[in-house]
């Protein structure tokens, strides 16, 4: 059985050398030590009891650091491959973007080259009369723009003046209404106390009030609402009965 084990060990050692060529010096030394141990035990005649131990150690060596290192290297290679694929995809996207930018720039350059040619081809056809017409047209446009600007400023100034005048008129109207209401109130009081005995100076006071109401600017304006009311009250006061004894 020892004779059968020795070729098996040699075959496994050769396969192990073919599989792992990176840093397997320690494992090879261990296998050589095992072979030496097998030969030594064969000479001593005590090989049979330790065959199972040798097989167990061989299995451990097969599944030991070499296999682990190979798995780690395989994982690193796969990770590197994925990273390279991602980088390749990114480079492809960048290439597409740069090609698009290059295409747009080439189109812009082509347009810029085409326009000067068109201007150069149109220039000889322009004579002095056309140039004068263009200059006159530009002058008219400039004049119209300036007149519009001046008119706009003038309108803004007039609007501001009108707004100020409007505020003044509103203030005057408010003041006149207050004065008119005061006069109407005094007229109403005079009408209520007209026939009351003991009011000697009532007629004189009423005439003064009527004179004040007639002298007010609001009474002279026939179109104003307040003047119409005042005229109505004045006419009513004139139609009051003037009976009784006055002092």
UniProtKB/Swiss-Prot annotation:
GO terms for cellular component: synaptonemal complex. Signal peptide: none annotated. Residues 71-196 form a coiled coil. GO terms for biological process: synaptonemal complex assembly. InterPro entries: SYCE1. Isoform 1 is abundantly expressed in testis and weakly in ovary, it is not found in other tissues. Isoform 2 is expressed in testis and poorly in brain, heart, lung and other examined tissues. It comes from the Eukaryota. Keywords: Coiled coil, Meiosis. The keyword Coiled coil applies. Residues 189-247 are annotated as: Disordered. Transmembrane segments: none annotated. The keyword Coiled coil applies. Residues 220-241 have a biased composition (Basic and acidic residues). May be involved in meiosis. Isoform 1 may be involved in meiosis during spermatogenesis while isoform 2 is probably related to a later stage of meiosis, in the development stage of secondary spermatocytes and spermatids. Belongs to the SYCE family. PANTHER family: SYNAPTONEMAL COMPLEX CENTRAL ELEMENT PROTEIN 1-LIKE (PTHR21731:SF1). This is Synaptonemal complex central element protein 1-like.
């Amino acid at each position: 059985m020892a004779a059968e084990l020795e070729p098996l060990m040699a075959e496994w050692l050769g396969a192990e050398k073919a599989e792992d060529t990176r840093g397997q010096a320690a494992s090879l030394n261990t296998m050589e030590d095992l072979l030496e141990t097998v030969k030594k035990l064969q000479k001593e005649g005590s090989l049979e009891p330790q065959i199972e131990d040798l097989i167990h150690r061989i299995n451990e060596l097969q599944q030991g650091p070499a296999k682990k290192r190979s798995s780690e290297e395989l994982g690193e290679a796969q990770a590197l491959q994925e990273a390279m694929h991602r980088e390749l995809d990114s480079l492809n996207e960048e290439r597409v973007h740069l090609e698009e930018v290059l295409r747009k720039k080439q189109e812009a350059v082509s347009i810029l080259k085409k326009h000067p040619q068109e201007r150069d081809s149109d220039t000889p056809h322009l004579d002095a009369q056309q140039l004068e017409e263009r200059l006159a047209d530009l002058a008219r446009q400039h004049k119209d723009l300036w007149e519009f600007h001046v008119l706009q400023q003038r309108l803004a100034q007039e609007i501001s003046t009108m707004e100020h005048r409007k505020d003044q008129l509103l203030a005057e109207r408010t003041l006149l209404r207050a004065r008119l209401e005061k006069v109407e109130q005094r007229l109403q009081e005079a009408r209520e106390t007209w026939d009351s005995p003991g009011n000697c100076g009532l007629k004189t006071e009423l005439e003064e009030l009527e004179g004040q109401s007639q002298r007010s600017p609001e009474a002279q304006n026939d179109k104003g609402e307040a003047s119409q009311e005042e005229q109505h009250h004045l006419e009513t006061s004139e139609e009051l009965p003037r009976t009784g004894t006055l002092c």
